[in-house]
Amino acid sequence: PAGMGGKKTVLVFVVGETARADHFSLNGYGRDTNPQLEKRGVVSFGNVWSCGTSTAESVPCMFSDLPRSQYSSGRAAFRENLLDILVRADVDVLWLENNSSCKGVCARVPARTTWEADDKRFCTDGECLDDLLIDQLRQAISANNDRDLVVVMHQIGSHGPSYFKRYTQDYRRFAPTCDTNQLQSCSQEQIV
């Protein structure tokens, strides 16, 4: 069903599971790390903790109904997740992937991966910048037939150790930078 007043509702859920909430200016960090997000009035959940340090653990946990203290991948595998509930509520769901995978969370919903697109504007050697997700989001919204839609965008974000490959020169704002995947060769100032 369409949202309030017959208009479709579009919710974009950005999964940046490698992002540190304490390094978001949206959450009070001293450096202006999220200027574009601040302009959009987004909701940042800064008081949230992951179930684990790996994508395989953290992503399924985010979409599980289990509390963090009771979460296990074995228990979650046999339960509905948030996306399943949305589909049962007659909401269209699309998963846009620019990370290693959805780790089973999107198994029962339509999903697209950036590496399938192989868009030369954003992709090099099989890795794509998160910017490509914006193009895919625009396509998904325009193709949607006036139905409520939830789009999950799973970013590569700040996955390391090749942090310097996660953004273009246009976004290089904080110097000095660590331009190698050999982090031991970089100073603390370059890394943070």
PLM features: what roles do these ranges have?
Residues 182-192:
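Active-site-proximal segments of metal-dependent phosphoesterases and phosphodiesterases across multiple
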